Amino acid sequence: YKQHSIEAEQRIHFKVGTVFDIAQTNCPKEDYPKYFDLGYTSEQHKQLYELMKTYCEKELNCKVHENQFNSVSLRGFFDPASNSISLSGMFDDSTKLSVLTHETAHAILHKELDKTQIKSEAQMEFEADATSVMLQSYFGLQIPESRQRHLADQYKTMCADKSISSADITKSLDHSHRAYKSVADNIN
């Protein structure tokens, strides 16, 4: 085979495998940081998190809940039906703040998309990430690498989508900037 005297054939094949989220295993929570960046404890981030939470609840009438999800990869989500944000309770202050700014952006930007405003998931994620980055910059915080990577991935996905024009991307950035300004101008 290696001397090419025997005919060889290469095949690609797939088989079913089992994959687990670390939260579905018996790995103790205190060991999670060995495998995942759960953020870090910070009094400044905790205060900003509380400030953002208060903004959501008072200005947007959007409740913010911390829950235990059965997944480390699910960090949070905005539910337009109940106008609420659910965040994973397993993360530390820095990650909770980053996720809350992202989900707050969804609450502002995507609460009431009408049927004529069809946006791809990548476009909505890009808008929420851009708003989150602007808010974290406004607070003087370093942007987490995971947020930067997510923003870049969503941008690449949008650029690859032939139905999304450069004008649409510009509109998304304008939309994100208006959402950022609505928070920055009204946060206590």
Residue spans for each PLM region:
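N-terminal accessory/interface modules of nucleic-acid-binding and processing proteins
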Residues: Y1-N188
